[in-house]
From Swiss-Prot:
Its main location: nucleus. InterPro entries: Mediator_Med18. GO terms for biological process: positive regulation of transcription initiation by RNA polymerase II. It comes from Anopheles gambiae. This is Mediator of RNA polymerase II transcription subunit 18. GO terms for cellular component: core mediator complex; mediator complex. GO terms for molecular function: transcription coregulator activity. Component of the Mediator complex. Keywords: Activator, Nucleus, Transcription, Transcription regulation.
Length: 211
């Protein structure tokens, strides 16, 4: 019991001290397959460890939602990510709604929590009432520039079939609350990728309202 109380106190102290990276800054865009190699070449020149080959990844991502019988929309949505190419823990991820905030802010900002888990996390979610909505695979390249992470990836269905003839490009940073200055650094970096790719704040609510 004492250990549980101590763990709860430590977590509360971490939250109050703003040392937990629970906020994601995000810009997204896409680039045609025919131009992707040019973007990868540009990123090799701009990012850290330019002498090494970019890190590759191949993941399966599953989206689970928890719904109440009286509600049409899910009360909570979480994602489970599993690496296909390396032995690594599964990642349980909660992603919140984008903050409204200042419309002049250069990036989208949303709550985000990532937790390493055992393979039993899927059974755990099912027991809690979560249901699998959909799953997909991603395969691509990852670069780093300081705290910034840049991924260039293909989204696949059935693990092998691309859903489009373009790559998804994402620029993101996980940081504690109160570090909004990183958004300006991301904007400056994104400018260096033009005109190859236009990284923007994506308004998903606008897509949901489309007929």
């Amino acid at each position: 019991m004492g250990a549980q109380v101590n763990a709860a106190e430590l977590l509360q102290q971490a939250l109050s001290s703003n040392i937990i990276p629970n906020q994601e800054f995000l810009l997204q865009g896409s680039i045609l397959d025919s131009a992707a190699e040019n973007l990868l070449h540009r990123l090799r020149g701009l990012c850290d460890n330019v002498d090494a080959s970019p890190e590759t990844f191949s993941d399966i991502e599953m989206c689970f939602s928890l719904k109440l019988p009286t509600e049409k929309t899910p009360v909570m949505t979480v994602r489970v990510r599993r690496a296909q190419d390396v032995e690594a823990p599964l990642q349980l991820r909660y992603i919140g709604q984008p903050e409204l905030g200042d419309r002049t802010r250069p990036t989208l900002v949303r709550s985000s929590l990532d937790i390493a888990c055992t393979p039993h996390v899927i059974d755990f979610l099912t027991e809690m009432g979560f249901r699998l909505d959909f799953e997909y695979s991603t395969k691509g390249y990852m670069f780093r520039k300081g705290r910034m992470k840049i991924t260039v990836s293909k989204i696949l269905k059935n693990m092998t079939e691309p859903i489009s003839q373009s790559y998804l490009v994402e620029l993101s940073v996980l940081a504690p609350k109160g570090q909004d200055a990183i958004a300006e650094d991301m904007r400056i970096f994104a400018e260096q990728l033009k005109p190859l790719v236009q990284l923007e704040k994506i308004d998903y609510k606008r897509f949901a309202q489309m007929p």
